[in-house]
A protein has these predicted regions:
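Basic nucleic-acid-binding alpha-helical/helix-turn surface characteristic of O6-alkylguanine DNA
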Residues: 2-135, 182, 186-190
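Active-site phosphate/pyrophosphate- and oxyanion-stabilizing loops and adjacent acidic/basic residues
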Residues: 59, 139, 177
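Regulatory, non-catalytic segments
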Residues: 139-148
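Major-groove DNA-recognition helix of helix-turn-helix-type DNA-binding domains
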Residues: 153
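Short cysteine clusters
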Residues: 156
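…primarily DNA-binding HTH/wHTH and HhH modules…
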Residues: 162-190
Length: 190
């Protein structure tokens, strides 16, 4: 999986156009409706449509840019849907979609750490804080995870409490349970 930070990937030519376009499409998953968005050749959003922070995530996509939104498909969105279908059918354990992150350096560091959690495994917020070399930043890590706008592909659903309890999730705890179930992760829910 290739990850680019913000909208400044290796290919600066993307930035040349005056008016940029973000393409949006919906995907109905077993856990609820997702909003998918692509910019150029990257996925920049995979968010639950009923997420109370969805609007914030959309604003973050457009910060400092002259963009328009268009409902329509792109090769990135088609491929994302295909890979999500495979994931929910239990046939895909890793995604191969180029992602475009739109967070702070700290958020991007945390989101990249989430990509290291293997399919079928879970980690605690404390584990992630240690993984990025900031063991005392557990609350900040939790905040960054909560701001993840690329659910499922950046597997924030694999993060649980230190006591193995199910903790908050943008798509709701039922969606989180469902995703963990897809990956055959059994927890003792508190």
């Amino acid at each position: 999986m290739t990850v680019c930070k913000d909208f400044t990937c290796k290919r600066k030519r993307i930035m040349m156009n005056n008016r940029k376009q973000i393409n949006i499409q919906y995907y109905d998953s077993p856990g609820g409706r997702l909003v998918l968005a692509s910019f150029a050749d990257s996925l920049c959003l995979c968010d639950w449509s009923d997420n109370p922070f969805a609007e914030r995530n959309m604003r973050r996509l457009t910060r400092g840019m002259n963009v328009s939104f268009k409902t329509g498909t792109t090769s990135v969105l088609k491929e994302t849907k295909r890979q999500l279908d495979e994931y929910f059918a239990g046939k895909r354990k890793a995604f191969d979609i180029q992602l475009r992150l739109t967070g702070t350096d700290f958020q991007n560091e945390v989101w990249n750490a989430l990509l290291d959690i293997p399919y079928g495994a879970t980690k605690s917020y404390k584990d992630i804080a240690r993984h990025i070399g900031k063991p005392k930043a557990v609350r900040a890590v939790a905040g960054a995870i909560g701001a993840n706008g690329i659910s499922i592909l950046i597997p924030c659903h694999r993060v649980i409490g230190s006591d193995h309890s199910l903790t908050g999730y943008a798509g709701g705890l039922e969606a989180k349970k469902m995703l963990l179930g897809v990956e055959t992760i059994e927890l003792y829910y508190k």
